Amino acid sequence: KHTHSIAEVSKFTQNFPSKAQKLAEKFWPGSLTILLPKNQLIPDLVTSGLKTVAVRIPNHPLTLELLKSLDFPLAAPSANPFGYISPTTALHVEAQLEGKVSYIIDGGYCRVGIESTIIEVQEEKTTIYRLGGISVEEIRTEIGEIEEVRHSSSNPKASGMLKSHYAPTTPFIIGDIASLSKDYDAQKIGVLAFNALQENVAEEHQVVLSKSGDLAEAAQHLFAGMRYLDTLDVEVILTELLPEEGLGRAINDRLRRAATTKK
């Protein structure tokens, strides 16, 4: 559920633990979703029968204005077909949902680029179910130790937990790009690289996420880059893992779930 203020949260939840409130005060509006026990105002249909509701205050003026105009929290699932690459612009949404929705509100490109971090705060433990725009390190700085649950094959507690997700239609392989490229026709390769172009592959068949090696910039460009490469006439998209720290962990999570093969 998306809402516009922390004060609104108590209207549709049973309790709001102090640690969760601390995180909300630090990171809202922003890329953090908190799972909280729902009250009777939230129908089971909205939460797929779960006893918790996912709550977030988004950090965009247009969305906040929309939410302030409503007298109820807004359920807002991802605007893309299940399992495909997440959209980060209104054009992405239009391309895949044209004719299926009445309106698309265009607020520009997504500034974070990847989905929110999903966390559940209970009295005895704090659990991250999806890595996202707020890093594990940032959360630990605020509330101490947390545990991670990254996969669920059935009845996931949060979105983005299935082992296969965010996937292009073109085969998508993780590994050492230079080595992998030897196995394919150079004219039929797409490359999603962290910070440098690859030799022997046409530049128009490559996306560099951040030439400066900035993880936040890489996150901004991730899904748009994957979508661009998926439109090309290539047989395979080759990619590499990023540094396993900060937002790099969330980016790598998306790459691994999207991958056809990991080498």
Ranges and model annotations:
Residues 1-263:
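Active-site-adjacent structural elements in enzyme catalytic cores
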